[in-house]
Amino acid sequence: MRRLSRLAGLLAALMLLAGCQREPTLWQQESYVFGTRVQITTADVPENVARPAVAAALADLDRWHVRLHAWRDDSELTRINRALAAGQPVDTDGEVLGLLRQAQDMSARAEGLFNPAIGQLVALWGFHADSFAPVRPEPGALARLLASAPSMADVQFDGLRVSSRNRAVSFDLGGMAKGWALDRVADRLRQAGVKSALINIGGNILALGSKGDTPWKVGLQAPRDNQAMAVIVLHDGEALGTSGDYQRYFELDGVRYCHLIDPRNGSAACQRQAATVLVEPGPDAGLRSDVASKPLFFAPRADIARLAGRFAIRDVLLVEADGHTWLSPAMQPRVQWLQRPQQVDVLTGFAEAPT
């Protein structure tokens, strides 16, 4: 079955939590891109400033949605994938080329646990569709695709030209496009004079300024119900990203399969319910918040601190398949529990949180 961004709706309600010394003037606009709900809320920004700035940002999102779509026939990404599958180099523009270069860098940082070159694997599992059937791939087809080992390391760049040493490379940027877009929307709003806003693209969130006299607050969804399990305060420039098994998934023979495909073995069987990261301000905070949650969704706990460090991240929350929840030392004081899980423990390998 398909679950359409329950988290996004939850965040919309929780970001308006009480606690301000004064009530700010809020203005909000919504849209639907990248297969999910988008909400941009401004605080104490005149509507004649907020409205055109947000409209321009939403227009950019609509354009990126079409250009970066992994299975639309008319998308720029599909055109590139077709050329690579035919063994041909292909020219693109600076915007897409820059994104692909970032994808290669992020994949290397993630030690292959984030691999945007496995679009064929995602399609084989049936997730290149707005709705999908509960069907496992044919084992032989899955084995052949895994043997071809598509990787971002196969991709080469020469000016605006993209080529691949491996015809099995097929780009699917769904694991980074929302975060990449967050950074660009934030830049557009800042340039338009919007100093305080909360940008929510399907649960990937970036805060600008504050909500009146207090920071923005967002809710963190409990993976197995439609309620918030915690609230997290976001300061200016911080970004929050979650990868979970509860948005796009199906169940078959008692096993939950989600759209997050493990690049190591091609499995969609979920070993973890969710991985959440909080990223400090920076020009790529949104991108890192989106990407870093993927390797942390797959990696064993012993590797979490090291992998998070490769993205300069200290704030991590994991929910295991049995609901056991783990937090890094820095994340502990940031989480305000509404429904505290039965088991909560501290992840090892991180530096202690500053006092």
Predicted regions and their residues:
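Mature catalytic core of soluble alpha/beta enzymes
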Residues: 2, 11-355
